[in-house]
Amino acid sequence: MNLKTTLGLLAGRSSHFVLSRLGRGSTLPGKVALQFDKDILQSLAKNYEIVVVTGTNGKTLTTALTVGILKEVYGQVLTNPSGANMITGIATTFLTAKSSKTGKNIAVLEIDEASLSRICDYIQPSLFVITNIFRDQMDRFGEIYTTYNMILDAIRKVPTATVLLNGDSPLFYKPTIPNPIEYFGFDLEKGPAQLAHYNTEGILCPDCQGILKYEHNTYANLGAYICEGCGCKRPDLDYRLTKLVELTNNRSRFVIDGQEYGIQIGGLYNIYNALAAVAIARFLGADSQLIKQGFDKSRAVFGRQETFHIGDKECTLVLIKNPVGATQAIEMIKLAPYPFSLSVLLNANYADGIDTSWIWDADFEQITDMDIPEINAGGVRHSEIARRLRVTGYPAEKITETSNLEQVLKTIENQDCKHAYILATYTAMLEFRELLASRQIVRKEMN
């Protein structure tokens, strides 16, 4: 180990020691270490078997579920649970790692799509997992094919790594990479081929550019797609979900390759994350019993259907950041069998995406079919989200708006409903959690 690496380790770990006692610093120690040695990540990661999880939606939950399973196998798994998924956050994760008690060093990391190529200059994953790619933060990522090419460029740097893809996404059909490829997906009963919803993106045939149809469409552009023009269809699946046993707003049960599993988290979109976690675990040699044990011990993920109480109100915090994710979150809360208040917190910082026009493509119209006595529109762009909610036809007099998140919290505390959902963009979620943590309603970190 050379001098600059040694200094980087010392500076990074010292800053982590100080910041952790102040309750801060998920990325700063890595930033400090990288200033001493820009290649320090290569030294830190060289003795690890690494699984990388990337994609638009579902990175954090897929990673958390996978870690829960692999802890049943290895006892200790390195990960970045708070979602610090750019190079400074990844460097911090390795800087603060504890020595493995089993002698097997394994890391499961969620990595930002735009940061992946740079990070792969320094790490050698054995497995890449891509959950999906949807339109997200257009000012940062551009359109979906730009994002996909960013990821493929990173994967090509590690040609020996296996790539695990969501086979239900037409975008992932026959990727131009030298790596071994495996697919996971929903293999449910098929019906007559039909067009996807008119507002769905990414439904052009990857071979002839015709419009795809679906024999089964789970949501957005995902499902058993087929092109009636050239015969192109979804590839054979290596990991198959064959039955939905139960689906509610806070849990689900399903069958994957003959084994029934369950997670204590709601929504169809999150079952894809569980399916990806099962596929990763099986790829790494875990059996179904260990997978079940891991799922049974899984708990709330940072800001992703995280539950807590404000006074006597049971509250659930849900991250939203793009049209598909927001629509699926709305589909999930629609399954609630009780009335609830709704808060929608919209920020427009860099990490949220500065362009907030995506809210007009999310299906907020569904709220008019739900038992929602009142809505709080909050965050920096509270007036924009309030306008979007009024356009749905929901009564304008039942919508309050404020940029003050303390006021949102106070409103929830004083409401008549015993249940509340808070849908929040990324930085709004962080700010709201910070407020909750300051009142000891939630833990600041979820390690």
Swiss-Prot record:
<comment type="pathway">
    <text>Cell wall biogenesis; peptidoglycan biosynthesis.</text>
</comment>
<keyword id="KW-0067">ATP-binding</keyword>
<protein>
    <recommendedName>
        <fullName>Lipid II isoglutaminyl synthase (glutamine-hydrolyzing) subunit MurT</fullName>
        <ecNumber>6.3.5.13</ecNumber>
    </recommendedName>
</protein>
<dbReference type="InterPro" id="IPR013221">
    <property type="entry name" value="Mur_ligase_cen"/>
</dbReference>
<comment type="similarity">
    <text>Belongs to the MurCDEF family. MurT subfamily.</text>
</comment>
<keyword id="KW-0133">Cell shape</keyword>
<dbReference type="GO" id="GO:0140282">
    <property type="term" value="F:carbon-nitrogen ligase activity on lipid II"/>
</dbReference>
<dbReference type="InterPro" id="IPR013564">
    <property type="entry name" value="MurT_C"/>
</dbReference>
<dbReference type="Pfam" id="PF08245">
    <property type="entry name" value="Mur_ligase_M"/>
</dbReference>
<keyword id="KW-0547">Nucleotide-binding</keyword>
<feature type="binding site">
    <location>
        <position position="227"/>
    </location>
    <ligand>
        <name>Zn(2+)</name>
    </ligand>
</feature>
<dbReference type="InterPro" id="IPR043703">
    <property type="entry name" value="Lipid_II_synth_MurT"/>
</dbReference>
<feature type="binding site">
    <location>
        <position position="208"/>
    </location>
    <ligand>
        <name>Zn(2+)</name>
    </ligand>
</feature>
<dbReference type="InterPro" id="IPR036565">
    <property type="entry name" value="Mur-like_cat_sf"/>
</dbReference>
<keyword id="KW-0479">Metal-binding</keyword>
<feature type="binding site">
    <location>
        <position position="205"/>
    </location>
    <ligand>
        <name>Zn(2+)</name>
    </ligand>
</feature>
<feature type="active site">
    <location>
        <position position="355"/>
    </location>
</feature>
<dbReference type="GO" id="GO:0008270">
    <property type="term" value="F:zinc ion binding"/>
</dbReference>
<dbReference type="Pfam" id="PF08353">
    <property type="entry name" value="MurT_C"/>
</dbReference>
<comment type="subunit">
    <text>Forms a heterodimer with GatD.</text>
</comment>
<keyword id="KW-0961">Cell wall biogenesis/degradation</keyword>
<keyword id="KW-0862">Zinc</keyword>
<dbReference type="GO" id="GO:0016881">
    <property type="term" value="F:acid-amino acid ligase activity"/>
</dbReference>
<feature type="binding site">
    <location>
        <position position="230"/>
    </location>
    <ligand>
        <name>Zn(2+)</name>
    </ligand>
</feature>
<dbReference type="GO" id="GO:0008360">
    <property type="term" value="P:regulation of cell shape"/>
</dbReference>
<keyword id="KW-0573">Peptidoglycan synthesis</keyword>
<dbReference type="InterPro" id="IPR054853">
    <property type="entry name" value="isoglutsynth_MurT"/>
</dbReference>
<keyword id="KW-0436">Ligase</keyword>
<dbReference type="GO" id="GO:0071555">
    <property type="term" value="P:cell wall organization"/>
</dbReference>
<dbReference type="GO" id="GO:0005524">
    <property type="term" value="F:ATP binding"/>
</dbReference>
<dbReference type="GO" id="GO:0009252">
    <property type="term" value="P:peptidoglycan biosynthetic process"/>
</dbReference>
<comment type="function">
    <text>The lipid II isoglutaminyl synthase complex catalyzes the formation of alpha-D-isoglutamine in the cell wall lipid II stem peptide. The MurT subunit catalyzes the ATP-dependent amidation of D-glutamate residue of lipid II, converting it to an isoglutamine residue.</text>
</comment>
